[in-house]
């Protein structure tokens, strides 16, 4: 497995792409209300990416994906396709996944949102998904084997009586949307690449309130939990630095530092 070490010039461009992707999530929050369609949200994000930020949606047309962002509601694990016929309801939990291209380089991030008041279970699931990502980010530094990321995520999620989806993983990112390495969200010691300064990849755990099994719908994209349980996901693009990592898609309202320094 060959992992691309980014040059300083590439890192500079990816900081810009990551910041832009994060800004889309910051912008869209106020628009997420009951009775708004997912296609409305898709169009708002598309216009912001293309016309305001002069960038490109990495999702639109990727292997035939028909929209500019992914919107996954409740039991949808990932790759939900926005539609005029799908409207938000009070109590929904929603993942919005943003991937953009700016000056030839990608930025990729996602987070969960609540539509109005939601259940205690929904909030707890989202909290554990977010915390599992943050715990893994605190591990990232040169010299760490990649499987440690999946190990800490799986241990934390399962200790909270939730389950980790194993069919989908994080990935290297740069000029290409998906590069090496594959970043698993569960422990697998075969995933033993040693992290090095200059690597850039996503960490994006998907966790379910029920069983971990998933199924792909007839549209070829939408992935749901088999048991119809709720699912939640958070995602960041991260750069391995000398002593830790920089979160390239950090958002202003996050309760974690943009720069995680792990000297010990």
From Swiss-Prot:
PROSITE patterns: MAP_1. GO terms for molecular function: initiator methionyl aminopeptidase activity; metal ion binding; metalloaminopeptidase activity. Its cofactor is Co(2+); Zn(2+); Mn(2+); Fe(2+). Gene3D superfamilies: Creatinase/methionine aminopeptidase superfamily (3.90.230.10). The keyword RNA-binding does not apply. Substrate binds at residues 79, 178. Disulfide bonds: none annotated. The keyword Calcium does not apply. InterPro entries: Creatinase/aminopeptidase-like, Pept_M24, Pept_M24_MAP, Pept_M24A_MAP1. Its EC number is 3.4.11.18. It holds the Pfam family Peptidase_M24. A divalent metal cation 1 binds at residues 97, 108, 235. Binds 2 divalent metal cations per subunit. Has a high-affinity and a low affinity metal-binding site. The true nature of the physiological cofactor is under debate. The enzyme is active with cobalt, zinc, manganese or divalent iron ions. Most likely, methionine aminopeptidases function as mononuclear Fe(2+)-metalloproteases under physiological conditions, and the catalytically relevant metal-binding site has been assigned to the histidine-containing high-affinity site. A divalent metal cation 2 binds at residues 108, 171, 204, 235. GO terms for biological process: proteolysis. Keywords: Aminopeptidase, Hydrolase, Metal-binding, Protease. GO terms for cellular component: cytosol. It catalyses: Release of N-terminal amino acids, preferentially methionine, from peptides and arylamides. Belongs to the peptidase M24A family. Methionine aminopeptidase type 1 subfamily. Monomer. Removes the N-terminal methionine from nascent proteins. The N-terminal methionine is often cleaved when the second residue in the primary sequence is small and uncharged (Met-Ala-, Cys, Gly, Pro, Ser, Thr, or Val). Requires deformylation of the N(alpha)-formylated initiator methionine before it can be hydrolyzed. PANTHER family: METHIONINE AMINOPEPTIDASE. This is Methionine aminopeptidase. The gene is map.
């Amino acid at each position: 497995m060959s992992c691309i070490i980014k040059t300083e010039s590439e890192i500079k461009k990816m900081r810009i792409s990551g910041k832009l992707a994060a800004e889309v999530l910051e912008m869209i929050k106020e628009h997420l209300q009951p009775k708004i369609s997912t296609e409305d949200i898709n169009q708002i994000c598309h216009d912001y990416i293309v016309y305001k930020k002069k960038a490109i949606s990495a999702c639109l047309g990727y292997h035939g994906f028909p929209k500019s962002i992914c919107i996954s509601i409740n039991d949808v694990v990932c790759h939900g396709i926005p539609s005029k016929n799908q409207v938000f309801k009070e109590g929904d939990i929603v993942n919005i996944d943003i991937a953009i291209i700016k000056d030839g380089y990608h930025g990729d991030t996602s987070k969960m949102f609540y539509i109005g008041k939601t259940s205690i279970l929904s909030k707890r699931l989202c909290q554990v998904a977010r915390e599992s990502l943050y715990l893994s980010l605190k591990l990232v530094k040169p010299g760490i084997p990649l499987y440690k990321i999946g190990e800490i995520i799986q241990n934390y999620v399962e200790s909270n009586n939730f389950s980790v989806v194993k069919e989908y993983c994080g990935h290297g990112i740069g000029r290409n949307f998906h590069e090496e390495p594959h970043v698993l969200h569960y422990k697998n010691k075969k995933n033993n690449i040693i992290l090095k300064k200059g690597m850039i990849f996503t960490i994006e755990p998907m966790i379910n309130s029920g069983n971990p099994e998933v199924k792909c719908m007839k549209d070829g994209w939408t992935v749901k939990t088999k048991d119809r349980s709720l699912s939640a996901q958070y995602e960041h693009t991260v750069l391995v630095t000398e002593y830790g990592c920089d979160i390239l898609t950090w958002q202003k309202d996050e309760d974690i530092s943009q720069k995680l320094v792990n000297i010990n």
